[in-house]
Curated annotation (Swiss-Prot):
Keywords associated with the record: Chaperone, Cytoplasm, Nickel insertion
Family statement: Belongs to the UreD family.
Organism: Chromohalobacter salexigens (strain ATCC BAA-138 / DSM 3043 / CIP 106854 / NCIMB 13768 / 1H11)
UniProt GO cellular component terms: cytoplasm
Main function: Required for maturation of urease via the functional incorporation of the urease nickel metallocenter.
Superkingdom per UniProt: Bacteria
Quaternary organization: UreD, UreF and UreG form a complex that acts as a GTP-hydrolysis-dependent molecular chaperone, activating the urease apoprotein by helping to assemble the nickel containing metallocenter of UreC. The UreE protein probably delivers the nickel.
InterPro entries assigned: UreD
Disulfide-bond pairs as recorded: none
Stated name of the protein: Urease accessory protein UreD
């Protein structure tokens, strides 16, 4: 079991009568509570169509059947017909002790698009301050394209946990994805004033690190309110794209096509394109990311963007 505690969290007491043995998921509500779920998916090109050839799950983390909304011949297509998959987590959010692990692999020639049917919610920690964890590993083999496009994450006041995303790209594999995070519930007058969330990103190509980032979000730290850090903003988003044949030209295309605003910026380094949003409008962050993806999609796949139907419900 991964240690999800932060410095200063109370140590786990000895197990007593009625407690579940350590190391497994169980109905317990002390500092050792642990609810694990995992999902492992694999995609492969079979006769010009991307097939989901591996789907293993443990706990309440599954997928709907694959969708194929992009039928039809595309001249000079680099990949097989795309497969759209929706990741389902019926609880709808993470509470203390939850630990989700998602592993996605796209093999050579495959083109997979993954999203979620709704926003992910990060709930307030329990009275013990037990953390949650969500860990995503994306593996892209040479000649494959993976699109990781989850709906936004809503972080409630008092939430404590870690989100990590690891991208392992090989050869000329391509990947585009985003993370949109909204802190607190301003509309309900419930800002994010307590708790601690940490986000980690790591991207490698052929084992070589191209982008690593660790971002702790602690409303009690000066960084959270200082203009040199979060600046008190409640919404942030990061979009990445790796594998573009002309990343600087893609940057210029985004600057030309997206509405000008001081809340977003885009750049590229080491052939990794990064777009950032920092502000207070969740819808604006989502729209910027979606518009950027629609611009980049043809650059990556020779196909126009096909918006998942679930986004429109």
């Amino acid at each position: 079991m991964t240690d999800l505690s932060f410095p200063g969290q109370a140590a786990s007491p000895g197990e007593g009568a009625g407690q579940t043995p350590s190391g497994g998921s169980g109905h317990r509500f002390d500092t050792r509570r642990h609810w694990a779920a995992s999902l492992s998916l694999g995609f492969r090109d079979r006769d010009g169509r991307t097939r989901m050839t591996r789907a293993r799950h443990h706990g309440p983390l599954r997928v709907q059947r694959p969708f194929y909304p992009e039928t039809g011949h595309v001249p000079d297509a680099r990949y097989a017909e795309p497969c759209h998959v929706y990741l389902l987590h019926p609880p709808g959010g993470l509470v203390s002790g939850d630990e989700l692990r998602i592993d996605i692999e796209a093999e050579s020639g495959a083109h997979a698009l993954l999203t979620t049917p709704a926003a992910t919610k990060l709930y307030r920690a329990d009275s013990h301050g037990v953390c949650w964890g969500q860990h995503t590993h994306l593996s892209v083999r040479p000649g494959a394209l993976l699109e990781w496009l989850p709906q936004e994450t809503l972080c409630f006041d008092g939430a404590r946990g870690m989100q990590s995303t690891t991208l392992d790209v090989q050869g000329d594999g391509c990947c585009v994805g985003w993370e949109v995070l909204a802190l607190g519930r301003p509309a309900s007058q419930l800002p994010f004033v307590s708790g601690r969330v940490e986000q980690r990103f790591a991207l490698t190509r052929d084992g070589r690190p191209l982008w690593r980032e660790r971002q702790p979000l602690d409303p009690m730290h000066p960084r959270f309110h200082g203009y040199w850090g979060q600046g008190g903003s409640t919404v942030q988003a990061t979009l990445w794209a790796v594998g573009l044949t002309a990343p600087q030209a893609a940057v210029e295309a985004l600057r030309e096509c997206l509405p000008a605003s001081r809340h977003w910026a885009v750049t590229q380094r080491r052939d990794v394109l990064l777009l950032r949003y920092l502000g207070d409008e969740r819808n604006a962050a989502w729209e910027i990311c979606q518009q950027a993806w629609e611009v980049l999609r043809p650059w990556l796949s020779s196909r126009q963007a096909s918006v998942p139907r679930i986004w429109m419900t």
